[in-house]
């Protein structure tokens, strides 16, 4: 027969005392967690959420005495109505870990409090990363410096691209069909500067969006559309230069004004389809947008938070496919340029010059005037070809700068869609503004590498040729200009005589 121990009540009292100590330690830990979370997330949590239900003490003790592996539903949990979902989930997981430790090591109040505080700091830090909290706000000096830099960048972008459009409109030598694509590119960059960069600067400096939820979608759509139009215009420019250099005789028949206008319209329609259609349907981002909190106040954010499907599809259409085409075109242009240089060296060898002089003294009578000079007939370095190669170099530099500016962003854009915590917020903003800065670089490239644009910029800035006095672009066709006729004749002479020997060239010159 079982005989009760005379001090059996002490055996029961000791675990109950340890349990009460553990509850007190949990209460202190919960208070520390509440204070830490309130500080790190800059939100106020009601003091009532840190109160522990005293009636749960018996339940906790009973559960641990009976060997339960977790807290009951009435155990020490913060009020879920006042906490984010991530924090509530982390709290439940943390309770399970604490329960396991209590079962393993016993109820030691000091150890339990230390474990809870350390875990609460870790989970609070992880929660900040998962939820996507905004970083610490910039200081006043940083805001002023960044604001001045962004203002200068926006001004250069707007002014430079307006100059490009005015130069093409007012300068007769720039009113060529190929420059219509440059004008379309300048318009896209002008939209980026005026409609995208201005609102992006205000959003990044304030840390939240103040222009309304509806305009946020419109702004994001313009961002995607203008960037896509810029890339597709560069792809069209590279194709235009390739045809112009590779097959100049057929260029006038293939690339007409109508073809150029239709191509530009198709570029803008495709850019609008990629941007406005999915964004208006709301399939470009997750259902729950991020919320920025400051001193208990919630502010909406407007960021390029894309779904993985839309990020991959839009990036391929807007960037990767056109880039593959442009790189392939410029590789072919480079090979053709190398072959062209070799042909120039082969035609102008010193031995052939002596041979031409010898045939000239034998076959041509002295009293018969020359109609053409041999050195001008077979040379490939006519002004027509020189200007073509300068244009190709200019467009190549434009494409290179464009890739440097936008490749990092599009790589990060796809990565961020699949892994929200892999890319920091500041890194994403810096790479986004690096892409925006490309809109300011193109006019600078024109002024450095293209003398015609440089002279046109000078005339516009000095008001030597007011744009209001310029003739209509549609009334001046490139085929009707004197320069086009002269270059076309020189080009045909070069092509017809490029395969002839020196003796045949002397016979032609003697006619």
From Swiss-Prot:
Alphabetical list of SMART domains matching this protein: 7TM_GPCR_Srsx
Extracellular compartment segments: 20-142, 207-216, 280-310, 413-427
Keywords for the protein's UniProt record, in alphabetical order: Cell membrane, Disulfide bond, G-protein coupled receptor, Glycoprotein, Lipoprotein, Membrane, Palmitate, Phosphoprotein, Receptor, Signal, Transducer, Transmembrane, Transmembrane helix
Residues with attached carbohydrate: 53, 63, 74, 117, 123
Lipidated residue numbers (S-palmitoyl cysteine): 468-469
InterPro entries in the cross-refs: Dopamine_rcpt, GPCR_Rhodpsn, GPCR_Rhodpsn_7TM
GO annotation, biological process: adenylate cyclase-activating dopamine receptor signaling pathway; adenylate cyclase-modulating G protein-coupled receptor signaling pathway; associative learning; cellular response to sucrose stimulus; chemical synaptic transmission; G protein-coupled dopamine receptor signaling pathway; G protein-coupled receptor signaling pathway, coupled to cyclic nucleotide second messenger; learning
Cytoplasmic compartment segments: 170-179, 240-258, 332-391, 451-511
GO MF annotation list: dopamine neurotransmitter receptor activity; dopamine neurotransmitter receptor activity, coupled via Gs; G protein-coupled receptor activity; G protein-coupled serotonin receptor activity; neurotransmitter receptor activity
Membrane-spanning intervals of the chain: 143-169, 180-206, 217-239, 259-279, 311-331, 392-412, 428-450
Disulfide-bonded cysteines: 216-302
Localization of this protein: Cell membrane
Tissue distribution: Expressed in the larval and adult CNS in structures that mediate higher-order brain functions such as learning, memory and motor control: in the mushroom body neuropil and four unpaired neurons in each thoracic segment. The adult CNS has intense expression in the central complex, moderate expression in several neurosecretory cells, and weak expression in two unpaired neurons in the mesothoracic neuromere. Also seen in the somata of the optic lobes.
CDD domains: 7tmA_Ap5-HTB1-like
GO annotation, cellular component aspect: dendrite; membrane; plasma membrane; presynapse
Signal sequence coordinates: 1-19
Taxonomy, superkingdom: Eukaryota
The family this protein is said to belong to: Belongs to the G-protein coupled receptor 1 family.
Protein name: Dopamine receptor 1
Species of origin: Drosophila melanogaster
Gene name of the encoded protein: Dop1R1
């Amino acid at each position: 027969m079982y005989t009760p121990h005379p001090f059996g009540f002490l055996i029961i009292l000791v675990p109950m005392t340890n349990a009460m100590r553990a509850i007190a330690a949990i209460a202190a830990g919960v208070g520390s967690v509440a204070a830490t979370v309130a500080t790190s997330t800059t939100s106020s949590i009601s003091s009532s959420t840190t109160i522990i239900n005293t009636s749960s003490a018996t339940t906790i003790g009973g559960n641990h005495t009976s060997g339960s592996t977790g807290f009951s539903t009435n155990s020490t949990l913060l009020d879920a109505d006042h906490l984010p979902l991530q924090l509530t989930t982390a709290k439940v997981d943390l309770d399970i870990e604490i329960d396991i430790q209590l079962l393993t090591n016993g109820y030691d109040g000091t150890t339990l409090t230390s474990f809870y505080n350390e875990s609460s700091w870790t989970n609070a830090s992880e929660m900040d990363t998962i939820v996507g909290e905004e970083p610490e706000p910039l200081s006043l000096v940083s805001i002023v410096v960044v604001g001045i830099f962004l203002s200068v960048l926006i001004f250069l972008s707007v002014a430079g691209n307006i100059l490009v459009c005015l130069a093409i409109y007012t300068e007769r030598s720039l009113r060529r069909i190929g420059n219509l694509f440059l004008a379309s590119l300048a318009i896209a960059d002008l939209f980026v500067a005026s409609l995208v960069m201005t609102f992006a600067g205000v959003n990044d400096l304030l840390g939240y969006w103040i222009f309304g939820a509806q305009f946020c979608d419109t702004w994001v759509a313009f961002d995607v559309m203008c960037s896509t139009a810029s890339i597709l215009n560069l792809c069209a420019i590279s194709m235009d230069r390739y045809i112009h250099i590779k097959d100049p005789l057929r260029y006038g028949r293939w690339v007409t004004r109508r073809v150029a206008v239709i191509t530009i319209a198709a570029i803008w329609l495709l850019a609008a389809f990629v941007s406005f259609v999915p964004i208006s349907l709301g399939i470009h981002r997750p259902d729950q947008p991020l919320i920025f909190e400051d001193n208990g106040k919630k502010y909406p954010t407007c960021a390029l938070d894309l779904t993985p499907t839309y990020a991959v599809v839009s990036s391929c259409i807007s960037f990767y496919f056109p880039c593959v085409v442009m790189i392939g075109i410029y590789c072919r242009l480079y090979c053709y340029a190398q072959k062209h240089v070799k042909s120039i060296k082969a035609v102008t060898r010193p031995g052939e010059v002596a041979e031409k002089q010898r045939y000239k003294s034998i076959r041509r009578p002295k009293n018969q005037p020359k109609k053409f000079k041999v050195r001008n007939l077979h040379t490939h370095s006519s002004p027509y070809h020189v200007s073509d190669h300068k244009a190709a170099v200019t467009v190549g530099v434009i494409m290179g700068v464009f890739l440097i500016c936008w490749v990092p962003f599009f790589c990060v854009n796809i990565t961020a869609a699949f892994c929200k915590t892999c890319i920091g917020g500041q890194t994403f903003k810096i790479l986004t503004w690096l892409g925006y800065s490309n809109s300011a670089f193109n006019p600078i490239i024109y002024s450095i590498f293209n003398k015609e644009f440089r002279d046109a910029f000078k005339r516009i800035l000095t008001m030597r040729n007011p744009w209001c006095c310029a003739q209509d672009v549609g009334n001046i066709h490139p085929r009707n200009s004197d320069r086009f006729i002269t270059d076309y004749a020189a080009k045909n002479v070069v092509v017809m005589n490029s395969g002839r020997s020196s003796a045949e060239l002397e016979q032609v010159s003697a006619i």
